[in-house]
Amino acid sequence: MSEARSVASGSSKLLGESLDPVATAPSSDASTSRSGFSNYLQPMDAESLIQQHEALLFRRAYPRNARTLKQTEKQLTKIANSVNRLGDADADLSPLDAPEVSGIAGTSVTSNFSFAIVRWLVQKYPAQLAIDWDWFEEEDRFGATMPRFLPLLEDDAMVEAHVPFRDWLSAAKGRTNEVAWIIERFDSLNLSDKEKAEIYDSLKLHVTWRYGVRSSRTGMKRPTRRVFFHDKPLIQRRDVSLVGELNSPAIPVRRLSRAEGEKILDLARETSAVRYRELHGFTYGDVRRVLKADLGRGTEVFVMGVAPENRLPLRAYHAALIFKNGVPVAYFEGLSICERTESGFNLYYTFREGETAWLYARILRLMRQLLGVTVISIDPYQVGHENEEGIESGAFWFYRKLGFRPVWPELMKLTQAEERKMAEDRGYRTSPRMLRKLAAGHMIFELPDAGNSGWDRFQTRNVGLAVQRRMAREFKSDPKEIRSHSIEFVERALRIKSNQWTNGEREALHNLALVLAMIPAIEKWSAGEKELATRIIRAKGGADEAAYLKLMQRHAKLRDALIRLGS
């Protein structure tokens, strides 16, 4: 998960204070009272506007009945006018810029988005973009880069202080939008997309996107043929069995057309960008490989992979955007190798009083179905390591009560001691200090009948570090030497002939060879093991990385070797 640099200020406490449980609880009488709605949209300041907006969004995703939904939709159409009215009254609107609540209709976001996202914005919404020159900092870099597009700029930029770069750009672009003009110039370069991105991203240009209502959180919604109404209490964590969900019947899934996939990826990029965020799978999602799954209870999930040119060298990557009654409520990121997946589940702040545990369990069921994964790893940050929001929310116990365990023995002992205290005193609460200790390491979930999978100490980073040490030890720290040697060795050991392979398959070979070359006696594998390893390499660069994972799950020797290298 990556986040574009935000120029907003604020904290997660703002939203936590604004969400009134009575306003968000579907079972509350207040959610359908006429008086509650008739007085609802009279914001006197930005904070009260946020409170009203977030409660309305929650009601839209979790409506109690058709009447509530209709009233909610009507109130949301008034949000942009409320923002404008507060602005006209010179109210302080800076709270609306906080990342936790950004994306409200009538506002904008400013961030140093990546080249890929800015180029996409230019394609979709060129008239809504502008450079925020107040945040222009990389003058030297700009002066060194832009002469290729601005003739004679060197005469100013190379020797003068306080160069009026904005004047140069304004004179050159004519009537073209300044952001669009810059992107057009970069696209004209005879370079790969990655090389263009490296140069553009080094400029750290802050782009303001003044989005329309449909792109805002206020107005963003997928059309739904059928709404699921919550006329009964929401599903709580105590009602969810992760083991039961993982073993539940298959979830209905279908592959979208290219046009449908493009629409979903547009929504995914929008819902991230208005929150100052970027996700690799949304930015580089493959429109040809988008799947739609129906989880039930009005919940749709769209799962996407990435094209071969943007894949990770070793792990398979999948992202998912999750809708509740047409409203985007969460996203998921899975980084997988063999049967192990690193799970990143992010519920948007507004919806954290919803059916979080059930939703997470259903997503994991879907990942097991699509990818064959049975071991789920949680990064310490998700649990609260260097993440005070995770500490405040008790994220550790959320995962622990679903069946996850700390992988470090010392943290498992602390966990069991805390559990004994809670069993003896129902009013006992783990202190923030203890939660920070518990969050220091990874957590893992395995199905009960699987036993210890051997993945406890594994980290992909360790595999990469082992490659670096070998490069320093045997190849004088020369990356070209270790690559060429590894490729030649693996091609010979596995009897690979790659001359007819696709570019993606060859790229996969070039990356995986660095790891395979470190496996002892790989040349002595059986013919069947070598043939399967070759299929695994090709699948990494093939159409769908799910095939890569499922083939890896069949190769016991490769799996064991990877665990040793990464542990």
Task: Label the predicted regions.
Residues 210-228, 304-314, 318-322, 357:
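Short secondary-structure boundary segments
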Residues 249, 253-352, 361, 365-371, ...:
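A conserved beta-strand-loop-helix scaffold within acyl/acetyltransferase catalytic domains
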Residues 122-273:
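Long, charge-dense tracts
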